[in-house]
């Protein structure tokens, strides 16, 4: 516990033994994050980012056999159109961008970045230090929910 006084005022700073999680209090967007050390964002059952993007893609085009076929066909076409080496970070980025172009028809999404250096900080615009930071997920909401809410 820390204390400070100035004139008639007394400031007391002490540990909060039962802090609340701000993600448990009426959130509009859902945070889906993937990190090997930290449990970030909201609970989800996605295996990885590809599983997450596939799910939102199918929710956009139709979560049925036809939608699954469209998804597979889109990936096949990307293999021919993307010039970066298959599996490279540049290739993965381009695949994600193309999937999100379709997903953006029904969803609003922002990337989530983490800076990990003597504590962690998150934002949606990225950090200038690529060594200690990178994208860890997305925060998203459906356009339908946004229109209903606002």
Locations of the language-model features?
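Acidic interaction surfaces
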Residues: 1-150
